[in-house]
Amino acid sequence: MSLLQFSGLFVVWLLCTLFIATLTWFEFRRVRFNFNVFFSLLFLLTFFFGFPLTSVLVFRFDVGVAPPEILLQALLSAGCFYAVYYVTYKTRLRKRVADAPRRPLFTMNRVETNLTWVILMGIALVSVGIFFMHNGFLLFRLNSYSQIFSSEVSGVALKRFFYFFIPAMLVVYFLRQDSKAWLFFLVSTVAFGLLTYMIVGGTRANIIIAFAIFLFIGIIRGWISLWMLAAAGVLGIVGMFWLALKRYGMNVSGDEAFYTFLYLTRDTFSPWENLALLLQNYDNIDFQGLAPIVRDFYVFIPSWLWPGRPSMVLNSANYFTWEVLNNHSGLAISPTLIGSLVVMGGALFIPLGAIVVGLIIKWFDWLYELGNRETNRYKAAILHSFCFGAIFNMIVLAREGLDSFVSRVVFFIVVFGACLMIAKLLYWLFESAGLIHKRTKSSLWTQVEG
C-alpha cells in the first residue's frame, strides 16, 4: 500500500468515523443512553477502530493486507450500512398518540422477581458445576485454544447457559439501583467471568460484557464521566490483551509484544479486515440465502432429539472460514455483521440487513423505554434486566453476523421467558399452600417496635 493510497483510505475512514460519531454524540446528549447509542459505538468499534491498527501493522511491520480498493469497499459498505440503519431507526412507523391505559401483558411482584433471578443464577451455576465436573480447569489442561472445540471437551452445550448469571445479577441491581448494588454487580459478574475463563479455557465474553454493562449503568446514573469511560476503555483493552496472551500461552517482549498487541487487539475488538477478505473473494461466494439463519439453530437441538443432526453447522461464520478462507484449524473466523449479509445475499442484502437491524434496535429501545415508564419497580427490573442482558446478543450481531444473532436472541428469550413462567408457577404453588404472606404496614411497624 502506497502513502497516496493510504491517504485516500484515511480520508474515507475519517469522514465515515466523524459521520457516525457525530450522530452518536447528538443521540447521547439527547438521551444519555439507549440501545441506538450502544449499537452505534459497537458498530464504530467493529468496523472503524481497527483501521489505525491495520495501518501501523502495514507501515511498521510490513504486514500484508487486502488491496486498497477492497479496503475502500469495506469502509464504504460500513458507512452506507450505518446510514440506512440510522434512517430506519429514526423513521416513525406510526403516529404518536397519547398514552391510553392498557391492560399489561404481565405483572410482577416481589416474590416472583426474586424467584426469577434465583432461577437464572441457578441455571448458570449448575451448568458451570456440571461442565467443571466433566472437564476441570481447561485453561491449565489444554495446549491450544482451538482444543476447547474438540471432542476432548464434553458438555460444550452447557456453555450457552453460563451467560444467564449476568441477567440474574442485573435484576438484583435494578431492584436497588444504588452505588453499592452497582459495585456488587461488577465484582460478582467479573469474578464469575474469571471463573468461567479458567474453566472453559480462555473465553473472555462474560468478562467483557459484565464490564461494559457496568460502565453503561455508570454513565446512565452519572457515576462515571466520559473521561473515566475512556480510561476504563483503555484499561479494558490492556486487560483483554493480557487475557489473550494467557489464552494462547504466548510470552512476548519488545517489538514482538507491540506487534502482538496490535493484531490481537484488532482481531478482538475490530475484525473489519475479515469483511475485506470476504469482499476480496466476492466472486467465489455461493450465496446462501437465509439458510445460515436456519442452520445456526441446529446447535441448540440435542443430538438425542435429532440423531441425524449435522455435526458441522454451515452458518455464515463457518462458510467464511471453510469455504472462502479454506481454513480448517477448528476456529470459526468472524465474518462481521456486514460479512454475514454478503454471504447470505451479496451486496443487495447489505441495505436490506441495515433495515432489519434498525427495526431490531428500535424494538429493544421501545422495551427499554417501557421499563423506564413502568411504575411497578419489580416489572421494571425484569424489563431492564432483559434489555441489558441482551447486550451480549448485540455484540454477537456486530461481530458474528445476523444468523448467529437470531438464533442466540431466540434462545435467550426462550430461557428468560421460561424462568419467568417457572417463577410465577412457583409463586402460585407457594400461595396456594399458604406459604406467601403479604407485607402490611402494620406488621412491619410491629416488627420495628419489637
Swiss-Prot record:
Question: Domain of life, per the record?
Answer: Bacteria
A GO BP term, please? enterobacterial common antigen biosynthetic process
Its keywords, alphabetically, are: Cell inner membrane, Cell membrane, Membrane, Transmembrane, Transmembrane helix
Q: Which InterPro entries match?
A: WzyE
Task: Tell me the route in metabolism or biology where this protein functions.
Answer: Bacterial outer membrane biogenesis; enterobacterial common antigen biosynthesis
| Subunit structure as annotated in this protein's UniProt entry | Probably part of a complex composed of WzxE, WzyE and WzzE.
UniProt record similarity statement? Belongs to the WzyE family.
NCBIfam families in the record: PRK02975.1 (NF002820)
Protein name, UniProt field:
Probable ECA polymerase
Q: Which organism is it from?
A: Escherichia coli (strain UTI89 / UPEC)
